[in-house]
Amino acid sequence: MNQAGRDAEDRALALLEKRGLKLVARNWHCRGGEIDLIMRDGDALVFVEVRHRGGSRFGGAADSITAAKQRKLLLAAEVYLSSHNIDSPCRFDAVVSVGGDAPQWLKNVITQ
């Protein structure tokens, strides 16, 4: 991951913690993929994809969460839940930013 990506993750984490979410894991990897941030929001476990683009020339940051990426996130989340024996409500959010703009938190970006 490059420095811009790390900075975007740091800003995303700060935003979510400011909104009351608690960090569970960061950059969690499994054979099928990676989850940038795993947070706790009350009873819900929140899987967060962080996306940053330097500019909007090729579309916004949210546009880069393709159907293939969504499938990888779902698979990684299933592996995480299974390997940690977790049975709680969960959702998939994204924190997106373009250029120097403030990050935006998008809830429920993937519906199962």
Curated annotation (Swiss-Prot):
It comes from the Bacteria. Coiled coil: none annotated. Pfam families: UPF0102. GO terms for molecular function: nucleic acid binding. CDD domains: PoNe_Nuclease. Belongs to the UPF0102 family. This is UPF0102 protein CV_0654. It comes from Chromobacterium violaceum (strain ATCC 12472 / DSM 30191 / JCM 1249 / CCUG 213 / NBRC 12614 / NCIMB 9131 / NCTC 9757 / MK).
